[in-house]
Amino acid sequence: MSYADEVFKQNCRDILQNGVWDTDQKVRPHWADGTPAHTVKKFGIINRYDLQKEFPILTLRRTYFKTCIDELLWIWQQKSNNIHDLRGNIWDSWADETGSIGKAYGYQLAVKHQYPEGEMDQVDRVLYDLKHNPASRRILTNIYNFQDLHEMALYPCAYSMTFNVSGDTLNAILNQRSQDMLAANNWNVVQYSVLVHMMAQVSGLKAGELVHVIADAHIYDRHVPIIEKMLEQEPQPAPTFVMDKTVTDFYQFTRDSFSLEGYHPQPFSDEIPVAI
């Protein structure tokens, strides 16, 4: 059994059995037909993934690995906020007529800040510290910029990464304010696991743990039947993560720098509606 499947099943069972519904509340998200999109949720879920032991991708259904990589590079490498720079259409619902999602995600990572060593954006500061100040307890990014929230098409869900070096190993904490368990949970886990591998490799470190802290872990009402079917699926073995070991510059990684060997997820034909 894939460990990611085990964690996902445990989280979803806990939410369905012990979670709290918001059907008595007025909610912002809605379905395409205008119906309010209500959820059942659990507060404060924390999951740990040892990236040395296994790559945490679901086998209960396919997580589209290359599309995950595309979005990761769009945000962290290109530092873009325009969907025309991104393969696929996952952000189309939040983009304006020019393709912009406002001052969100990649935009925030591209903003330069003044440091004693000079001007750097958040990504470059992380890369600098991992190489020059690995013992620092100040290596982090945060894209939840209150000053710019009013100009964001969507407030950041996964908003902060804290990196910590222990010996020759890079660990990280991903903080997430909100998590759609069906549509996005494993998507985010896969992306930020790859990010830890990338940061570790270019810094001469080993990838260690990814700790995922979720404030509001929820299942939408129209997702419940799909989740229940997935809980009955038989998990498959986790695949092997492969990364181009010759890349030493963070900005030289491409979608082709990564692959999975032995990834055989269960068939999945359900269409997943997305609340917006």
Where are these regions (language model features)?
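Terminal, non-catalytic protein-protein interaction segments that mediate quaternary/complex assembly
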Residues: 1-276
